[in-house]
Structures are given as C-alpha cells and as structure tokens.
Amino acid sequence: MTTGTASAYTPDALHTLRDSFELHLGASRAAKTTRIYLAALDALIAHLEAQGMPTGARGVKREHVESYIARRREEVKPATLSLEFRALQQFWKWALEEDEVERSPMERMKAPRVPESPVPVITPDDFRKLLKTTEGRDYVDRRDAALLLLMFDTGVRRGEVAGLRVEDVDLKDRMAYVTGKGGHTRAVRFGSKTAIALDRYLRLRRGHRHATTDAFWLGQDGPLTGSAFAQIIAKRCVAAGLPRLHPHQLRHTFAHEYLNAGGQEGDLQRLAGWRSPQMLRRYGASMADDRARRNYTSPADRL
C-alpha cells in the first residue's frame, strides 16, 4: 500500500539532495566550509517554500534563485552575500555533475559585487605598545611575546599558528612549517628578534607540566586554541590601552609591511598561502594609497 508520504516523494527534492551534498562536502571540504555551504542551501530552500516556488532541483529556475539573492541583498553585507552565492554555485555544480539537473539555474549569473574596502592594519607604534606589555620574564609574558612576534613577522593565520607542533619550528634556520587551508603545508621565514623570543619561550616551556605534549603553544591546562589567541591579544590590548585588535589584523599588517618594503605580490601570495590573487589585491589595497604617495616623485622637479 502506498502511503501519502511515499506519493509525495520527489526524487530530486532539494531536501533529499541536501543530504547527498553534505556527504560530498564532508569528503572534500573543511567542516567550517561545509556548515557555510549547507546554511546557504537551507536558506534557499526555506525561501522557495515560503514563496511557493519549486523545491525540486529540476524545477528551480534562474528567476527563483535571483528572487532569493534579491532578498538576501537587503539583509546581509555584500561579502556575506558573495559567500552565499558561491556556496549555492557549488551546490548546483555538484547537482549537474551528479546528473540531478540538466543545467544549473545559476548558469551565467554574475556574482554580487563586493566593494573593495581596505583591511585595517596595525601601526608600528601600536604594535610596539602591544609588545611592551610582554616585557616580563615569566612564562606567560615570554609565550605571548613569542606569539605576537611570530604572527606579526610571518602573517600566519590564527588556525595555522594554533596547529604548530614543537617539531615544526626550526630556530636555527628561522623557519616554521604551517598547515593552511585545505591541508596544504608551507614554510614561512621569521627574523632574528622573533627567533630570540621563540627561544626564550621554549626554554621556559621545558618546565611546563604539559611539556611532553606535541603542541607548540601551551596554556595552564594544555594546548592553546585559536580562540585562546584572540583572548590573549584582547588582554594585551587592554594592558596597552589600545582598541581591541583581531588576530587577523596581524596578517593584514604583515602583507602591508611586506609590500611596503618592496616585496613582490607573487612572492607574498606564496608566503601567505593564498590560492587566489583576489585576496592579495584586497590585502594590498590596505595602504596602497600611502605607498603610492611615498613613491611619488615630482615630474616638474625632473625638468
């Protein structure tokens, strides 16, 4: 006997395909990316249902997706809308590859424009103030000084520095090996001041009760997490009398300082672990006007 539920079943229902898409993402994407992609798909499904639009994959047309995008444009920032747009593109790309649809309803749809806004950087004076709060000789001060200098000197992401193991840091060659997005490992260089700070921290780390742990950074109860780094920086900002800084601003500042010192954009892209030049352009724009003014020479004076 066929039940009402069975008769209402639609093979290409977005609700059904969502579970299969989640399996696909779990095999190829990070957990955070998976959550973002599924949230975007769930929001689209909810919109289609609320508007009485088709919820079977083959019935969804461009105008249905555009209706959702238009609504979200009024609700979220351009960067968030762009992220959701790309997430939905990935879903329809997957559905096309799996023969669930004959063509993507997002085919030839243009991604929402994200205005290029300069990312905030930390001035050298403010970083010195931040570092001055770590001038003590105890374990916490030595650890925090090493952490701040390493992030400032290399531009590594918070998650990358949190994932460091003791064996990943080579003081002699002043190199650290970090694992970035997608599990890609790269080597980053640091300077002599950072090497000295790391050495001072490691000497005190040997006496820590969790010293046998592989994790490079240790708190009172064991390895530090990325969220703990944000708390450390926030605490140091208060001590220095500075506005709260986000750990990613150290990455922004590294990019700016590297270009300001004459570094090449292609080299910076490799050092920072960016797979797309789009991020490079955004970071490089942070102080591009300042660099342009500094490099200005008067054509009249050359007459």
Regions found by a protein language model. Name each.
Residues 1-303:
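Conserved catalytic core of the tyrosine transesterase superfamily
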